[in-house]
A protein has these predicted regions:
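Short, acidic, small-residue-rich periplasmic hinge/interaction motif at the N-terminus
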Residues: 21-82, 570
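Outer-membrane beta-barrel translocator/receptor signature
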Residues: 145-148, 159-235, 243-247, 321, ...
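Short acidic/polar hinge/loop motifs at secondary-structure boundaries
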Residues: 103, 114, 130-154, 173-174
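Membrane-embedded beta-barrel scaffold of Gram-negative outer-membrane proteins
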Residues: 330, 336-342, 346-350, 514, ...
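Extracytoplasmic beta-strand/coil segments of soluble accessory domains associated
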Residues: 53-76, 80, 86, 92-131, ...
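Gram-negative outer-membrane beta-barrel transporters
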Residues: 464, 574-576, 595-685, 718-721, ...
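Acidic/polar loop-and-plug regions of large Gram-negative outer-membrane beta-barrel proteins
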Residues: 219, 223, 238-242, 246-328, ...
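Face-selective signature of the C-terminal outer-membrane beta-barrel domain
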Residues: 323-346, 369-484
Length: 747
């Protein structure tokens, strides 16, 4: 019913607005027919035609209106046109097309990104520059149809987003109100009962001074795995009003509703294990221990490839609502004031059995306990910026002074105690998974996080060929955690309160050398910080630890060549995360203690090329190399401490590469496609579990008639069996080869 209500609401609203906006269209003279040139296939600007839109404003890298070419940092931009051309259905698929990015959807529909040696919560996920929470706490699968573009900034970005973002930031950008009439329609059907519908309309409301945009997307699949159906509904609205030449107001609203049955992965079966920490260890037939062991002959049984071991009544359901009001006031030609007030809410309920591991002795699957998760979050915030464009000593200068206030109130809940399953183990094939035990959601804690931040950014033209780009941000973070119920026991614990405060200063300093009209070189130093664990999980046991620090040196080149037919970016980086927790022995007591003396380092290079040689051809290539390792890290195993120094962090590939080629023919036909390569990754800090590298190939053939385009697309054409995100005792495998038929139009 929710899906129906979303669709009904969007159709009624969009239809009413579009009817109002199109009333005068019938009177338009025939000479206005060239408006057909707005079709994306025909007239998309160069910045939209490439995955390297160097002259597009990169809002994730600066609030001073700098383009990607002008910014001393690496920013990839995936436009809506790119998503449509490549058939990128979700934000995760879109992000993976960017240079050096890997991604996947974890259980419960949680996106997981990795770049430059860092992943998980080290990569912040934003919506219009606003982070609702850490990625694992609030991020959901988002249909790409409702987005204007996605921006991916590499490396620490505390300047823009505050706490977090040591590895990078992924920013979902909403569509703005449309000043011209435009409608978009998308429909597709593919394997396993998958279908997708998108409807968008926008334009001016004549005589009112208002512009609007409304987009609705419905995405459903039964899933390749048994009992893995997923539904995603998204409605995005925006309304803009220009009161006069100086004042404008714009409201953005996004409403997300999803429900899915979770597939946690296929159990990794093995013949025996070897303890890698013991010299000369012999194989043992026992349960695998991820911190010390290596499996002998690990594999997924093909007969169990589609089996879902989760309980029959599992589900993960969320509702997310984002509202943002932006006010732009031009005080003088040189001074502009911008304010953004926002509120974001999340309601999540989660009922799953999350652990299914192989028992080589009993030759069956050992199951975990019932996991119940409840989240009820409200984020309130306001961001105020003052921009001054005023020369200094005859040199152009842009200065921004800003302040941010946020209050994030979060309620967390789970099962009342350790709720065991009535069926503790099942067979590998044809398992009788049964239903989970009846257990209510119990509120366990209430967390409040308040942030006050001040920041400044400046762009100063030192000479006609050199520009200094500077930024500084100060954050004061206050945390209060009220424990309401201890869910590790059925006996309630007394009410307790924990408080913690942090102060941190981050920023970026860089320089841009203008080598020619189309080629820039740059270098920069950027910093960010984050707690040892996400703030929502912070407890008294981690109260004494300070924020972890991230620092990156980067240099690169951005330019257009061959009479602007070739766009290219190249970057080298050296990124370090310091003060990570590591275990040592107290020299006095001999006890194992945790200290912030560890480090994780990565260095590498990234190259991206986009070539438009003419005659309907389009060629794009990108690749990244990353050398990532723990520089000083001892892991506490409970009974011992073992060094992980020199080991590669989990889920970090050395090589990632993409290629995409498109050819448009004069008769309306077009073809496109290309391969993607990701090298081996490790599933644990011990580097004893390997997720094999893989190559996937997607391709499509399309026919365009008038405003309509029909496409037949093949996905994973090599039928590669692979893990998008490396696992250990369970492997969450991607879908095999599939086909999809789609229809889209714009008018």
């Amino acid at each position: 019913m929710k899906s129906f209500s979303f669709l009904t609401l969007s159709l009624i609203l969009a239809g009413a607005l579009h009817a109002q906006a199109t009333k005068p269209a019938a009177k338009a003279p025939a000479k206005d027919d060239p408006i057909q040139l707005e079709q994306v296939d025909v007239t998309a600007d160069k910045e939209n035609n490439f995955s390297l839109p160097l002259d597009a404003v990169a809002t994730s890298g600066s609030r001073l209106g700098l383009t990607s070419r002008e910014l001393p940092a690496s920013v990839s931009i995936v436009t809506q046109e790119m998503m449509q051309l490549r058939g990128l259905r979700t934000a995760v698929e879109a992000v993976e097309s960017a240079v050096g990015m890997t991604g996947g959807t974890n259980f419960g529909s949680i996106p997981n990104y990795s770049t430059r040696g860092f992943g998980g919560n080290n990569v912040t996920i934003m919506r219009d520059g606003i982070r609702q929470n850490t990625a694992s706490q609030s991020s959901r699968t988002v249909d790409s149809f409702i987005l204007d573009r996605i921006e991916i900034l590499k490396g620490p970005d505390g300047l823009m987003f505050g706490e977090g973002a040591i590895g990078g930031a992924v920013n979902y950008i909403s569509k703005s109100p449309s000043p011209t009439l435009r409608s978009d329609l998308l429909a597709s059907y593919g394997g396993w009962g998958s279908y997708r519908v998108g409807l968008g309309v926008g334009g001016p409301l004549k005589g009112t001074g208002f512009n609007y945009r409304a987009d609705y997307a419905h995405n459903y699949t039964n899933g390749y795995q048994d009992r893995n159906s997923q539904r995603y509904d998204a409605l995005a609205l925006s309304v803009g009003w220009r009161a006069n030449e100086k004042l404008s107001l714009t409201w953005f609203g996004t409403f997300l509703d999803d429900w899915n049955e979770s597939y946690y992965g296929s159990p990794t079966i093995y013949d025996a294990v070897i303890n890698t920490t013991v010299a000369g260890a012999v194989p043992e037939v026992r349960t695998f221990v991820a911190t010390t062991d290596r499996m002998i002959n690990p594999r997924v049984d093909p007969a169990a490839r589609r089996t879902n071991y989760n309980i029959l009544d599992n589900y993960a359901a969320t509702e997310n609502v984002f509202n943002r009001l932006r006010t732009d006031l031009r005080l003088t030609p040189e001074i502009e004031l911008r304010n953004e007030a926002y509120v974001a809410t999340q309601l999540l309920k989660w009922r799953n059995e999350e652990s299914n591991t192989w028992n080589p002795v009993a030759k069956n699957i050992t199951r975990g306990a019932l996991t119940l998760i409840y989240r009820d979050d409200v984020l309130l915030g306001d961001r105020l910026d003052l921009t001054i464009k005023q020369p200094i000593a005859g040199h152009a200068n842009r200065l921004l002074i800003g302040a941010v206030f946020e209050r994030n109130d979060q309620i967390r809940g789970g099962a009342p105690g350790n709720v065991t399953l009535t069926i503790p183990s099942v067979t590998l094939l044809n398992p009788n998974v049964g239903y989970g035990p009846a257990a209510p959601f119990k509120k366990t804690s209430r967390i409040g996080v308040e942030t006050h931040a001040f920041h400044l950014q400046d762009v100063f033209d030192v000479t006609s060929n050199f520009r200094a780009v500077l930024g500084l941000r100060y954050d004061h973070i206050s945390l209060q955690r009220d424990t309401l119920f201890n869910n590790t026991t059925a006996t309630p614990t007394p009410f307790s309160t924990f408080k913690k405060g942090y102060r941190t200063t981050t920023g970026r300093i860089g320089g841009v050398w203008i080598l020619s009209k189309t080629v820039n070189a740059y270098a920069s130093l950027s910093r960010a910080s984050e707690p040892v664990t996400q703030l929502v999980s912070l407890t008294t046991t981690s109260a004494d630890f300070s924020l972890q620090k991230g620092q990156q040196y980067e240099a690169g080149l951005k330019g257009s060549f061959l009479q602007n037919k070739l766009d290219a970016t190249f970057a080298v980086f050296d990124l370090e995360k310091r003060d990570i927790l590591t275990s040592t022995l107290d020299p006095v007591t001999g006890l194992r203690i945790s200290q912030q003396i560890g480090a994780q380092k990565s260095k590498g290079a990234e190259l991206a090329l986009a070539l438009s040689p003419g005659d309907g051809w389009r060629i794009e290539l990108n690749g990244a190399y990353t050398d990532s390792k723990f520089a000083d890290f001892n892991e506490n195993l409970g009974t011992s401490v073992i060094s992980r120094t020199g080991k590669r962090p989990s889920n970090v590939p050395e090589w990632v590469a993409n290629a995409f080629v498109a050819k448009r023919f004069a008769n309306g036909f077009s073809v496109s496609g290309g391969p993607r390569y990701v090298s081996d990754r490790f599933g644990n800090n011990n580097n004893s579990v390997v997720a094999d590298g893989y190559v996937t190939v997607d391709a499509s053939a399309s026919y365009t008639w008038s405003r309509w385009q029909v496409s037949l697309r093949g996905r994973n054409l090599l039928d590669e069996d692979y893990e998008p995100v490396a696992g250990t005792t369970m492997r969450r495998l991607a879908d095999p080869i599939s086909a999809e038929l789609s229809l889209r139009t714009s008018f």
